From Swiss-Prot:
Gene3D superfamilies: MFS general substrate transporter like domains (1.20.1250.20). The chain crosses the membrane at residues 19-39, 47-67, 85-105, 129-149, 157-177, 178-198, 224-244, 252-272, 283-303, 309-329, 344-364, 366-386. It comes from Escherichia coli O157:H7. This is Uncharacterized MFS-type transporter YhhS. Pfam families: MFS_1 (PF07690).
């Protein structure tokens, strides 16, 4: 974890601008993810002629690479400093675009082209884990550990914004100039971000002996489990709300997803200081309660308005879960290990979103679509109970956690 430079307290607009000046690098990395997201499956299946399996694999490779490389990103950020990790990650985003470009140029050799696409996706996954983890830690190093929750919140806001912006823009660029034009745009985005990052002042890496990975995992896994359980609610809404509306014979599934996103972002903007004021665990328990009510409303909905209110509440409830628990998780380890702690904590969400779809699909095929929302509410209730137990633990078992309140 970087050591923040002592300076007068930041607040309000100046604080947010300072954070945004760093998390914009994560925005750039996620823009390189969003731009090809709606293009590559159709390109692999319809243009290159490969099966739907390969189309799905090309997309999934990035997520697997992110999952496997994220703990290394946190550890190297602790050892080398977050700026170097961010630049390294952005270089990976640039190389992914180069992979797409060469894949487009070798379209007459489908197997070679597919391998180059896969290589680009793997490099992108590694780049994103380094750029995302590094930008969070860089932001904390710039504004101080008191504002960890706000840095995490802004990082997630720019993530969703980049993905929402990137997908439609990617389709436009692809129709305009094909895969090669899209690849050049991706390379340009990454290159501009690299050139903006290099001149920025370096935040020093923390001094001290790092804890072994097993020790870091032992400090944060309970917070990660609570996050993973709560993420199931997000997973079933993002993956199956369209199918839920189809089964019910309703229109407006896309609007429901928009409501979820607006509630998610709006809650973070409305309550930027909530974690500092009442503590991460308290905020998490409030969020779990709201998310449970929302998921239950969706599960028992007999009218479209009930489902929409439920989705809105679920989005608002899930919004602050990641930063609220993350603040406590990273403060459960010494400062020189907080990068590894944040990365390890984030892996639990990655895993949860990876397994929620298949498991919910099995439950849905057995008991129907609405049941998955009731089951997700039950998982969030377990997260609420787990967080309540964590709050009741003696303070010495979660060092520095109280400082977030």
């Amino acid at each position: 974890m970087p050591e923040p430079v002592a300076e007068p307290a930041l607040n309000g607009l100046r604080l947010n601008l300072r954070i945004l000046s760093i998390v914009m690098f994560n925005f750039a990395s996620y823009l390189t993810i969003g731009l090809p997201l709606a293009v590559l499956p159709g390109y692999v299946h319809d243009v290159m002629g490969f099966s739907a399996f390969w189309a799905g694999l090309v997309i999934s490779l990035q997520y697997f690479a992110t999952l496997l490389s994220r703990p290394h990103a946190g550890r190297y950020a602790d050892l080398l400093g977050p700026k170097k990790i961010v630049v390294f990650g952005l270089c990976g985003c640039f190389l992914s675009g180069l992979g797409y470009l060469t894949a487009g140029l070798t379209a007459s050799l489908p197997v070679i082209s597919l391998l180059l696409l896969c290589l680009g996706r793997v490099i992108l996954g590694i780049g994103q884990s380094f750029a995302g983890t590094g930008s969070t830690l860089w932001g904390v190093g710039v504004v101080g550990s008191l504002h960890i929750g706000r840095v995490i919140s802004w990082n997630d806001i720019v993530t969703y914004g980049a993905m929402a912006m990137g997908a439609p823009l990617g389709v436009v660029f692809y129709h305009w100039g094909g895969l090669q034009a899209l690849a050049l745009i991706i390379m340009g985005v990454a290159l501009v971000a690299i050139l903006l990052a290099i001149p920025r002042p370096t935040v020093k890496a923390s001094k001290g002996k790092p804890l072994p990975f097993r020790a870091v995992l032992g400090r944060v896994w309970l917070y990660g489990m609570a996050l993973a359980l709560a993420s199931a609610g997000f997973g079933v809404i993002a993956t199956f709300i369209t199918l839920f509306y189809d089964v019910k014979g309703w229109d407006g599934a896309a609007f429901a997803l928009t409501l979820f996103s607006c509630a998610f972002v709006g809650t973070r903007l409305l309550f930027p200081n909530g974690i500092n004021r009442i503590g991460g665990l308290n905020v998490a328990m409030i969020c779990f309660s709201v998310e449970i009510i929302g998921l239950l409303l969706v599960g028992v909905a007999t009218m479209p308005w009930m489902a929409k209110i439920g989705v809105l509440l679920a989005g608002a409830g899930f919004s602050l879960v990641f930063p609220a628990l993350g603040v406590v998780a990273v403060k459960a380890v010494p400062q020189q290990n907080q990068g590894a702690a944040l990365a390890t904590y984030t892996v639990f969400m990655d895993l949860s979103l990876g397994v929620t779809g298949p498991l919910a699909g099995l439950v849905m095929s057995w008991a129907g679509v609405p049941v998955i929302y009731l089951a997700a509410a039950g998982l969030v209730a377990i997260a609420l109970l787990l967080t309540w137990r964590l709050k009741k633990r003696p303070p010495e078992h979660v060092p520095e956690a109280a400082s977030s309140s």
